[in-house]
Amino acid sequence: MKRIKFGLATQIFVGLILGVIVGVIWYGNPALPTYLQPIGDLFLRLIKMIVIPIVVSSLIIGVAGAGNGKQVGKLGFRTILYFEIITTFAIILGLALANIFHPGTGVNIHEAQKSDISQYVETEKEQSNKSVAETFLHIVPTNFFQSLVEGDLLAIICFTVLFALGISAIGERGKPVLAFFEGVSHAMFHVVNLVMKVAPFGVFALIGVTVSKFGLGSLISLGKLVGLVYVALAFFLIVIFGIVAKIAGISIFKFLAYMKDEILLAFSTSSSETVLPRIMEKMEKIGCPKGIVSFVIPIGYTFNLDGSVLYQSIAALFLAQVYGIDLTIWHQITLVLVLMVTSKGMAAVPGTSFVVLLATLGTIGVPAEGLAFIAGVDRIMDMARTVVNLTGNALAAVVMSKWEGMFNPAKAETVMSQSKTEQNATISG
């Protein structure tokens, strides 16, 4: 009798369901997080441990192999341009849906559980004191090793790109250095596969803690907001990304099926970082050049948070409607412009979505205290927007590869179809 092997997606789904069941049974029990939180934190720490080495080694291999700085500069300009266009679409879609469905009308926000947001207020104050020039100046590190310790991804990318260009410029003398980082890259992707073996346990622990703390009751008073956010994110995922994928020559449904393991893991953990290494590996498998993948995806984690900005635009109008504040078209245009800036400038800040909302609400006259009432359901919405964020960045690698004339859609479709067949065969044993 053949041994039945379950794929990673199935294992994670089982962990997710068991976590929900345990969280519901022990809802409000302070002892549960004491036992489960360390397990979830351990899994997240294992992932964060390998993200920076993978980004650095992959970026060096990709950029040094790409050649001159002119090519890298062109790719950088096109990437940022694409990110700005797609995130602007997300903001406008969020505002349009909030205006049509009015999720905040008739909601008594005081029925919702109030949460502590003081940490986000302090972070917002720190960030608001920085000028736009200071924000962009921060991209260039004064000490690369300090940036590594702090996990400052933009500063790390800046140094790594320059270092890779230096390796490329010295020709033969740079080959041993390049070979070293190729070895690092291969080794780290092997470590990723090892870490993924404990992913179902991490998901079980994280979901169990979340449900035990917030329960399902908080969904009732803020159900309209949560429902609209999920509908909006699903629309963006299928329709907007579907159009982008079609232009790139692939099917969005095959693309999503190809990434189902990563999508389920990101949804369960509310963390894009947990799947960054696997997303990079999978985009290379469907034909995206390593240089483009290692450049576009890490930068996208800072500049291309489509799910987050879509949520932020809906949440801002939701709070305005709750407080009975009528926002004119000019207020909403201001909101679009402010979100376009703040969502980029604060992308590496902990609790980004809340910090961005705090920075934005004041510009349109909406009381920031309202965020304390929606904080209780933020984790539930964060799960969905994380999926859109990671899908957007994976798709961006495909778009940039296509734009550079280095992507074969037919080959990609074949690889994605083969992958689905192999996964099904694994599950059926």
From Swiss-Prot:
Q: Where are the transmembrane segments?
A: 6-26, 46-66, 80-100, 151-171, 191-211, 225-245, 247-267, 291-311, 322-342, 354-374
Q: Which GO terms describe its biological process?
A: amino acid transport; dicarboxylic acid transport
Top-level lineage group:
Bacteria
Q: Which InterPro entries does this one have?
A: Na-dicarboxylate_symporter, Na-dicarboxylate_symporter_CS, Na:dicarbo_symporter_sf
- Keyword flag Kinase: no
Q: What's the chief localization of this chain? A: membrane
Task: Output the Pfam families linked to this UniProt entry.
Answer: SDF
Where does the record say this protein resides? Answer: Cell membrane; Membrane raft
Q: Does the keyword Amino-acid biosynthesis apply?
A: no
Induction behaviour: In the presence of glutamate in the medium, the expression is reduced two-fold, at high potassium concentration (5 mM). In the absence of glutamate, the expression is about two-fold increased at the increased potassium concentration.
Extracellular domain ranges by topology: 27-45, 101-150, 212-224, 268-290, 343-353
Q: Could you give one GO CC term from the UniProt record?
A: plasma membrane
Q: Which terms in the Gene Ontology molecular function aspect does this entry carry? A: symporter activity; transmembrane transporter activity
Tell me what topology the record assigns in the membrane. Answer: Multi-pass membrane protein
Q: Which residues lie on this side of the membrane: Cytoplasmic?
A: 1-5, 67-79, 172-190, 246, 312-321, 375-429
Keywords carried by this UniProt record: Amino-acid transport, Cell membrane, Membrane, Symport, Transmembrane, Transmembrane helix, Transport
The record's SUPFAM superfamilies line, in alphabetical order, gives: Proton glutamate symport protein (SSF118215)
Its subunit composition reads: Homotrimer. Interacts with FloT.
Q: What does this protein do?
A: This carrier protein is part of the Na(+)-dependent, binding-protein-independent glutamate-aspartate transport system.
Report the family membership.
Belongs to the dicarboxylate/amino acid:cation symporter (DAACS) (TC 2.A.23) family.
State the protein's name: Proton/sodium-glutamate symport protein
